């Protein structure tokens, strides 16, 4: 079955007032639990805010941070992109921010 990355940008939740964060957290945890119960959850979580990231490109090391950094993500194991989009919509409502959906391309040399 295909796996899909569902992610949001690092500052996508900056518009949410601090007093609303407990409700957002609870809603997000409810969607995670729903995905676990449905057997589609692979893993997920938030990423630390970028400070001085290092990115290696063509052997060159460059200091970050970069505005397009991922702030949070999850991976779901579902039969289709349409199903992944349904989960992304649930996450978007819970997190109050847009989500990006991308299919993982398996590496046939390692058997995943």
Listing of model-derived features with the role each one plays in the protein:
Residues 1-112:
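Conserved, structured core segments of small domains
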């Amino acid at each position: 079955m295909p796996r899909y990355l569902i992610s949001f940008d690092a500052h996508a939740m900056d518009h949410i007032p601090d007093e609303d964060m407990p409700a957002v957290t609870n809603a997000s945890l409810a969607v995670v639990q729903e995905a676990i119960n449905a057997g589609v959850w692979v893993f997920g979580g938030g990423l630390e805010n970028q400070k001085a990231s290092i990115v290696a490109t063509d052997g060159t090391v460059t200091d970050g941070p970069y505005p397009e950094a991922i702030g949070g993500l999850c991976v779901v194991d579902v039969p289709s992109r349409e199903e992944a989009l349904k989960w992304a919509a649930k996450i978007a409502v819970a997190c109050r921010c847009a989500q990006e959906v991308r299919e993982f391309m398996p590496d046939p040399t390692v058997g995943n």
